[in-house]
Amino acid sequence: MASATRAVFGELPSGGGTVEKFQLQSDLLRVDIISWGCTITALEVKDRQGRSSDVVLGFAELEGYLQKQPYFGAVIGRVANRIAKGTFKVDGKEYHLAINKEPNSLHGGVRGFDKVLWTPRVLSNGIQFSRISPDGEEGYPGELKVWVTYTLDGGELVVNYRAQASQATPVNLTNHSYFNLAGQGSPNIYDHEVTIEADTYLPVDETLIPTGEVAPVQGTAFDLRKPVELGKHLQDFHLNGFDHNFCLKGSKEKHFCARVHHAASGRVLEVYTTQPGVQFYMGNFLDGTLKGKNGAVYPKHSGFCLETQNWPDAVNQPRFPPVLLRPGEEYDHTTWFKFSVA
């Protein structure tokens, strides 16, 4: 059984409100989540010796999250990932979003779901956050009611996303936690062994927008169906890192997505999801300038993300899984992060 407690995390400037921190605890995990961006700020898990380490990158104070930073631990919306040139059409009408990652719109825009205060509700074994995204917010059509629920069950953190729209709008919600199973502050993730259950992936152009091709992983650097050690794999294939969508086996039921094993500590993270894709990102843009928890710095490749999602730019790609939510429908997706030791 898990328990949930709450405390003040900080005050937003100019009377913007109080940010609370919620701590979920089970016999195997401890997770801290704040109401700013539904952000996971800490996640403590034991190694095979029974020693606990915090395995997510982030900050000890609210100020860290208010500065320019790469979405550490946050919920991303209204649409995660990139929309080409920040434009799309719904039912013949064209919409224009802010270009916040030239020349595209990234992760919901200038002030996405990661940069707003959510309303919390404590549950017996978790916490539910809700907000209403007004019609026209960041250029998106229609009002969107959103609920994000975190629950803890033993070694498993479950994240459920629900949304209802007043008019047709693209919706694609994810969590942008950066993990390092050696413990946050460890210099890199090269000794992590990764498996991703995907037969195909999406090649991208130089601005990281999918070309439209769905390419087989067979015989490429993207074949992660059997475990690979990241450092050696990058060297073998002369890669700068991953920042790609892997296409999961298309079922709306819970399915296996990825497994990461850190041999030295014994920690294992398995990810399951109802989503059709996962963005595997290796922190290629981290550059060591941000000061994190306990004086940690976060250089390139010091954390990895497994962002379960619909495929990037799906709103402009008719052959990709549908991303539009219409009135009367409910967006409902769940991702499971399961921690263990091996």
Swiss-Prot record:
The keyword Phosphoprotein applies. Mutarotase that catalyzes the interconversion of beta-D-galactose and alpha-D-galactose during galactose metabolism. Beta-D-galactose is metabolized in the liver into glucose 1-phosphate, the primary metabolic fuel, by the action of four enzymes that constitute the Leloir pathway: GALM, GALK1 (galactokinase), GALT (galactose-1-phosphate uridylyltransferase) and GALE (UDP-galactose-4'-epimerase). Involved in the maintenance of the equilibrium between the beta- and alpha-anomers of galactose, therefore ensuring a sufficient supply of the alpha-anomer for GALK1. It catalyses: alpha-D-galactose = beta-D-galactose; alpha-D-glucose = beta-D-glucose. The modification N-acetylalanine is found at A2. This is Galactose mutarotase. The active site is at H176 (proton donor), E307 (proton acceptor). GO terms for molecular function: aldose 1-epimerase activity; carbohydrate binding. Keywords: Acetylation, Carbohydrate metabolism, Cytoplasm, Isomerase, Phosphoprotein. Its EC number is 5.1.3.3. The lineage of its organism: Eukaryota, Metazoa, Chordata, Craniata, Vertebrata.
